């Protein structure tokens, strides 16, 4: 019932419960609801609920195995509970426990470049291997790549939906949604039979940021909805991270805008983990599903890049000149080699090769800067 009351928030429900001691009194406390400035539409619905809609909701919830969590339940996500306008109810398919895990939102363009898509997947995989749950919005582009990156390494991922849980949007992501449910959770504040609508997605975004200790924007235009998520994260007192890109790419301008406004510039996994005060993962932890270059046999392109790097630090431009590869290819390969522990990012935009002896001792100290 609470999910269908327009404009009702967790703050309203908690305040009323504190005043009366009864969750059920919501329907019988018209005066209190007015005093708490609950919207008239919500008051009217609570006074005269649509019983047929509620019965249909209940039937679907029971048949689908959905868990319903109210803001009064211990299972309600603690970080989300701290935010203004948090939803009074969450519908969950999958692991309820995942909602209480340490989460990082990874978001960005629905139409990313190949480099942006690769960065989303690789960063999500590395962050998941570091113990973070990857939270995103199941949208095309960066969202989907982020979910897949976490799934690749057996990590936990949460999809916050802008529809009811009975409607996967976009429909092409039905299989991805099933994988997320099996390895994490699908959640929504919207009751069953809620169709996709433009006004739903900014509301979804506040939950994505509210669940998370920080938000990483991988790639975004200046009009991207992911900038809404970043703004909400900042307003909620959470960290905001952004990956820079080409000055000529419209898909990078949103990230550059965030960096100018104070977002943490991200070039490596360590940039995120150090800001969140999370230790770097131990060397040798890798995906069992997505092979990295050092596993079994290294692709010739990676061998050429490592040969070009040698054992003296070099800049990206120097490596492009030595290999003859495109800037996007070299940047993507360096990221993968860095995540695999073969290369270290140094101050000043330089890269250094890590030897087997280095790996046995520890990660390169500059990774911790």
Features from the language model and the residues they span:
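N-terminal positively charged helical leader segments and presequences
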Residues: 1-85
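Glycine-biased, small-residue-rich flexible motifs in mid-sequence functional cores and linkers
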Residues: 7, 62-369
């Amino acid at each position: 019932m609470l999910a269908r009351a327009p404009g009702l928030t967790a703050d309203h429900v908690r305040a009323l419960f504190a005043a009366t001691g009864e969750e059920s009194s919501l329907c019988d406390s018209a005066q209190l609801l007015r005093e708490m400035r609950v919207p008239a539409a919500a008051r009217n619905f609570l006074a005269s609920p649509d019983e047929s809609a509620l019965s249909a909701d209940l039937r679907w919830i029971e048949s689908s195995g959905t868990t319903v969590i109210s803001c009064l339940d211990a299972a309600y996500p603690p970080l989300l509970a701290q935010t203004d306008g948090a939803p009074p109810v969450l519908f969950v398919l999958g692991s309820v426990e995942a909602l209480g895990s340490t989460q990082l939102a990874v978001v960005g363009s629905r139409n990313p470049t190949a480099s942006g898509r690769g960065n989303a997947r690789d960063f999500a995989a590395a962050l998941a291997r570091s113990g973070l749950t990857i939270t995103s919005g199941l949208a095309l582009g960066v969202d989907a790549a982020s979910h897949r990156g976490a799934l690749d390494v057996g990590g936990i991922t949460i999809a916050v939906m802008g529809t009811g849980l009975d409607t996967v949007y976009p429909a092409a992501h039905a299989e991805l949604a099933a994988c997320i449910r099996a390895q994490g959770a699908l959640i929504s504040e919207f009751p069953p039979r809620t169709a996709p609508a433009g006004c739903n997605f900014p509301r979804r975004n506040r939950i994505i940021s509210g669940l998370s200790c920080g938000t990483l924007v991988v790639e975004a235009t200046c009009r991207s909805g992911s900038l809404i998520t970043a703004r909400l994260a900042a307003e909620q007192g959470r960290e905001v991270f952004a990956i820079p890109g080409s000055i000529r790419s419209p898909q990078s301008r949103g990230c550059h805008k965030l960096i100018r406004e104070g977002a943490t510039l991200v070039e490596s996994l360590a940039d995120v983990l150090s800001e969140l005060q999370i230790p770097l993962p131990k060397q040798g932890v890798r995906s069992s599903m997505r092979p990295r270059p050092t596993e079994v046999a290294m692709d010739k392109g990676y061998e050429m890049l490592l040969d070009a790097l040698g054992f003296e630090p070099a800049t990206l431009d120097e490596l492009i000149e030595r290999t003859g590869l495109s800037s996007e290819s070299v940047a993507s390969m360096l990221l993968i080699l860095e995540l695999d522990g073969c290369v270290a990012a140094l101050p000043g935009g330089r890269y250094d090769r890590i030897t087997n002896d280095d790996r046995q001792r520890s990660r390169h100290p500059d990774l911790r800067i």
